[in-house]
Amino acid sequence: MKKLIVALLIVVTMVPALFATGSQEAAAPAAVAKPIVMKIGHAQPVTHPRHESLLKFKELVEARTNGGIVVEIYPAAQLGDEAAMLDATKLGTLQATRGGLFERVTPKMLIYTMPFLFDSLEGIEKVTMGPIGDKIAAFAEQNGLLVLTTGDAGGFRQITNNVRPIVTPEDLKGLKIRAPGVKTIVKTLEAFGANVVTIPYGETYMALKAGVADGQENPFVNIEVMKFYEVQKYLTIVDYQFHPDPFNVNPAWYKSLTPEYQKILKDCAIESMKYNNQLNKTASLKAFEVMKNALEVTTLTPAQRQAFKDKAMTVYAAFIAEGIMTQAELDEIRAVSK
């Protein structure tokens, strides 16, 4: 009998302990949710302002989300060329990409690249990062992309070659000039008299070295970081065009985020893109110093530059007729960019 009483006492004593243990387990903190990973790919090397500004974006986003979003950056076309990265962003296997092939983001962005449309980098930023830029960016969703903001891909574009100095449009006749597959560049260079060859950005150096192309066109920053000056002899400063640098994200992925996270990404994209634009200005000055020592430089006089402008005017008529832009839109850009 005594043994039975002792056994019952043991059971009674253990029951509260068991309940206490259960309640402690229930009160244990939930596991911390995994951070959201945002993979961003681009084609420029790590020394380019695009990469440096994306590092700034990463710093801002991870700080403002307290590590809730982790940004991974893949430079130098590690994830494929610009076309492949744009397609991956549309599919959602890549969350974001910047720059390059903006025509595929929306043909409306071609309006930025019309020859001699802008007179200053400050004017470019007013347009691309203002209400006009927002209206143009909105067209990207028709092509399965969402543009957080649009910046400057490197400043005004110049022409280099290894055959002769370019002083007049006639000097370009017969020269094979490499260009990306952007219609406005192709049409403009053809209007100048050049024979255009389309070659991927990452293959341009070897194409110039092998003579597949006689020359190319790019901003100072790109010419310097890609070392195109090593395989060229002449540089003509013509400031004929600039390229936009859209910050493209996958719409479904972006809209799956909380409104708070969406706002953080948008704000950080704008802040880092302004930083990008400033970096480009500084890098352009440094790159030009390299150009002066490596190439024979021709700076066009206003009268010489006007001859190129006159040749390029046919490009405007063609794209207005195609319906990509209107004269009213061009006039608005000119007015805002002053």
Label the predicted regions.
Residues A17-S23:
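Juxtamembrane cytosolic interface motif at the C-terminal end of transmembrane helices
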Residues M1-L4:
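Positively charged n-region of N-terminal signal peptides that target proteins for export
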Residues I136:
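Basic phosphate/pyrophosphate-binding loop/patch that engages nucleotide-derived ligands
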Residues V6-A7, L54:
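General helical structural elements
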Residues S23-G123, I132, A140-K338:
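N-terminal secretory/targeting leader peptides
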Residues L8-A17:
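Bacterial N-terminal signal peptides
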